[in-house]
Structures are given as C-alpha cells and as structure tokens.
C-alpha cells in the first residue's frame, strides 16, 4: 500500500527514540487463510481487496522496516474479513483480554490503513474503555474520501487525533 513502508520505518524510529513512552507495544496483522469474498480479482478497496497477507507467504510477515519487537502479535482475518485488532488473537488470547491482563488503560494506534484497520481498532479500543489516540503521522490511508470519513467517525467516538495521515 502506498505509504506503508514509510509508516513502518517511522513507527520504528519513534519507538526507538522514545523507549520509555510505552509500557507495551503490540502489533496486529492480517493473517488470511481463506477469507472468502474479502479477496477479489476486481476489488472495491472497501469490502474487497486483492490477495494479501496470505498465511505461508512472505506477505503475512510484518514489514522488515518495522524493527519494533512487539510483546504480542494479534493475527486476524483467517477465514473472514477482519479489520479491528480486537478481532484477532495472539496464541489464543484476544487483544481486549491481553490489554486488560496488562492493565492498559490508554493506547496509541498507528499503522495501515487509516480508513480501515486503524479506524476499526481505535473504535473498538474506545468501546473497551481505553483512552485512545491515533498518531496520524504514523498511518497511511487508502483514499482521501474514506480517510476523511474515518477521521470524522473517530473524532465523534472520542478518539484523540494527532498529526496528519498519509493518503495513497
């Protein structure tokens, strides 16, 4: 995705430059086996996408420019579309449970895509009672229209928005 490599590098640089800023760093990733209609030869880039992040391929790995060592990686979307990190799990533990077990009450959300996975994860974090900030300089979105709509939804839900997203 356009801007994804720069986002991965920028996340790594920020975490390295401020190692005491976060108690925990976790990652989420698409981890597709057979997500059905989520994959399409003619994607609409809203509900359907080209094949990506397929288990057993290099594409499922976190980008090599993301040099952060996450405490846990939450896989999502094996057999159906999943946008929120809260739909995934790490070794059988879902993100909400992991955050509760680690007494997390605030979270910064970063990554791709601003208008899909970042939005869904941030909204679910707020629903879980977590004080949520999206660091927009560390995100990249699919399209200007969907990013603008997502930013409105995030703001309306009480998510703190900092910076400006990159848009492909």
Where are these regions (language model features)?
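Active-site acidic carboxylates
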Residues: 1-77, 101, 127-134, 142-168
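Short, surface-exposed loop/turn motifs that are enriched in glycine and acidic residues
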Residues: 51-56, 84-88, 111
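Short catalytic/ligand-binding loop motif for oxyanion handling, primarily in non-cytosolic enzymes
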Residues: 33-37, 82-83, 118
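Alpha-helical scaffold elements lining the catalytic groove of polysaccharide deacetylases
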Residues: 78-102
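Glycine-rich anion-binding loop/nest that anchors nucleotide
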Residues: 104-120, 136-139
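Short, well-ordered alpha-helical scaffold segments within catalytic/effector domains
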Residues: 8, 92-96, 119
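Short, small-residue-enriched loops and turns at beta-alpha junctions
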Residues: 81-82, 139-143
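Histidine-anchored nucleotide/phosphate-binding helix
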Residues: 14, 116-127
């Amino acid at each position: 995705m356009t801007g994804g490599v720069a986002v991965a590098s920028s996340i790594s640089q920020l975490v390295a430059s401020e190692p005491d800023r976060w108690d925990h760093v976790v990652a989420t990733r698409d981890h597709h086996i057979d997500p059905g209609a989520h994959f399409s030869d003619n994607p609409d880039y809203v509900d359907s996408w080209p094949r990506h992040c397929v288990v057993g391929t290099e594409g499922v790995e976190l980008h090599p420019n993301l040099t952060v060592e996450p405490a846990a990686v939450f896989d999502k979307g094996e057999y159906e579309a999943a946008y929120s990190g809260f739909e995934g799990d790490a070794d059988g533990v879902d993100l909400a449970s992991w955050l509760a077990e680690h007494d997390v009450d605030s979270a910064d959300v970063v990554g791709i895509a601003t208008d899909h996975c970042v939005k869904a994860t941030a909204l679910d974090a707020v629903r879980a009672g977590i004080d949520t900030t999206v660091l927009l300089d560390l995100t990249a979105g699919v399209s200007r229209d969907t990013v603008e709509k997502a930013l409105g939804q995030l703001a309306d839900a009480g998510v703190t928005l900092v910076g400006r997203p990159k848009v492909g």
